[in-house]
């Protein structure tokens, strides 16, 4: 009888023992290795800067190579590192004794860990992407992308997400030398220098809140402070504040949105800042295969040749993915930031050509926000028109193809602003890109 009772107790306890063993053997760690190879052919016949008569177009293939290492220890720690090489085909010789491409760089390298319940922190080099890239974006179109050295503290519940960002940048300028000294052991003061290719700010403080007050309705609020210094007054901090709202909504086949941002404080030269950005769009899905978007962007600007102006009214989308908004040929807020601002009405038509492909066409009309004095054809605010055509096709799970053609017709006022002469009437750009993103290895242990 005792044996029967013991056997029954053992069988009853067995599932609990097995479950406990399974819980003990549940992997706490995971590791994923992924990669990206993205070559892009470009025929630049006026991209970035309009070509003048007699100038030849640029023909090249640029390439991005990334290797991503993503480690998780349960929900207690994430460590992410993205190594990157950016080059032009032919930049490195066939027999490569020295790496002329600049070698490997670290695109992202951060650790993320919980602080308390719904509060977590991410520290290190990381992308900052907010509200469809208008003010903070990844700049993914550029072969190198954009990342910040920063601390990111997040809190989230069902409907509300709070994100904060803090950064302090430092580089050392060698007195009369023309380059930044990368020596981390430099004992001299703190001389921060802003120059092309270096950091656009010394310190950054930003808070972003997003609230979903309905499943298809969301509102965001951003306040950001940019601490700037220039080489002439390096002991003085010029702080510029950006404050704004971003709204997106959807109802059946209709999608709509609006955003507004105000900039105040000082610009990098120490001049008072008083600028704003307004944007709105409406998108309608006519059929499962066809949609249209009508939108308008307005970035305030200054009048030209106004000696009485005491304030800088030019809005600065300092870390936005501006390629996405103001024309794919990058004539506005990429290669050139117009002090006169920009009015940009646009129309986008998107056609789904197959289960794996779609075709998109966008037309832009560019006009200055501020007055342009001395334009010979008296169209004192007309800056030009642009058309962008893009075809996307997913070849397989990890491979996609993109190709595009853009045409830009600058006005005489635009050429005058950029001090360009004898400019061709039409500028165009042709490109084709292959994006390969395989997951190479994944394991739990």
Residue ranges of predicted features:
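Cleavable N-terminal export/targeting peptides
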Residues: 1-26, 439-445
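Transmembrane beta-strand segments of Gram-negative outer membrane beta-barrel proteins
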Residues: 23-48, 75-81, 217
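Sequence/structural signature of outer-membrane beta-barrel proteins
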Residues: 40-48, 88-94, 126-139, 167-173, ...
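Surface-exposed loop and membrane-interface regions of Gram-negative outer-membrane beta-barrel proteins
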Residues: 49-63, 73-116, 130-139, 266-273, ...
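Extracellular/periplasm-exposed beta-strand and loop segments of Gram-negative cell-envelope proteins
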Residues: 56-58, 196-198, 249, 271, ...
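Signature for the C-terminal beta-barrel architecture of outer-membrane proteins
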Residues: 117-121, 139-308, 347, 352, ...
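C-terminal structural cap/anchor segments
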Residues: 298-387
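Outer-membrane beta-barrel "beta-signal"
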Residues: 424-445
């Amino acid at each position: 009888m005792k044996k029967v009772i013991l056997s029954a107790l053992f069988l009853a306890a067995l599932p609990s023992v097995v479950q406990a063993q399974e819980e003990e053997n549940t992997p706490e760690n995971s590791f994923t290795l992924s990669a990206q190879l993205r070559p892009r052919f470009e025929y630049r016949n006026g991209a970035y800067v309009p070509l003048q008569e007699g100038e030849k177009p640029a023909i090249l293939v640029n390439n991005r190579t990334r290797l991503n290492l993503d480690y998780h220890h349960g929900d207690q720690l994430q460590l992410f590192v993205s190594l990157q090489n950016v080059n032009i085909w032919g930049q490195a010789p066939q027999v490569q004794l020295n790496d002329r491409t600049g070698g490997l760089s670290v695109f992202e390298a951060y650790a993320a860990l919980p602080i308390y319940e719904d509060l977590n922190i991410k520290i290190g080099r990381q992308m900052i992407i907010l509200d469809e890239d208008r003010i903070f974006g990844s700049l993914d179109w550029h072969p190198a992308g954009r990342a910040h050295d920063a601390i990111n503290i997040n809190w989230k519940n069902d409907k509300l997400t709070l994100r904060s960002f803090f950064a302090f940048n430092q580089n050392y300028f060698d007195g009369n030398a023309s380059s930044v000294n990368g020596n981390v052991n430099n004992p001299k003061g703190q001389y921060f220098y802003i120059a092309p290719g270096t950091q656009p700010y010394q310190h950054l403080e930003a808070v972003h809140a997003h609230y979903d007050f309905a499943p298809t309705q969301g509102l965001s609020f951003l306040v950001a402070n940019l601490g700037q210094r220039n080489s002439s007054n390096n002991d003085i901090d010029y702080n510029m504040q950006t404050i704004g709202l971003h709204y997106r909504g959807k109802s059946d086949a209709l999608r709509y949105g609006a955003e507004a941002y105000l900039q105040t404080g000082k610009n990098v030269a120490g001049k008072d800042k008083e600028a704003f950005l307004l944007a709105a769009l409406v998108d309608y899905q006519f059929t499962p295969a066809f949609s249209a978007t009508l939108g308008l962007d307005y970035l305030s600007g200054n009048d030209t040749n106004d000696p009485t102006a005491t304030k800088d009214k030019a809005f600065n989308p300092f870390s936005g993915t501006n390629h996405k908004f103001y024309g794919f040929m990058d004539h506005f807020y990429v290669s050139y930031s117009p002090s006169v601002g920009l009015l940009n009405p646009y129309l986008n038509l998107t056609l789904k050509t197959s289960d794996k492909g779609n075709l998109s066409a966008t037309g832009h009309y560019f006009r200055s926000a501020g007055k342009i004095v001395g334009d010979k054809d008296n169209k004192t605010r007309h800056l030009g028109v642009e058309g962008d055509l893009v075809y996307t096709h997913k070849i397989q799970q990890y491979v996609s193809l993109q190709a595009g053609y853009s045409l830009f017709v600058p006005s005489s006022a635009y050429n005058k602003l950029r001090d360009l002469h004898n400019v061709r009437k039409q500028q165009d750009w042709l490109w084709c890109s292959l994006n390969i993103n395989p997951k190479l290895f994944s394991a739990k242990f």
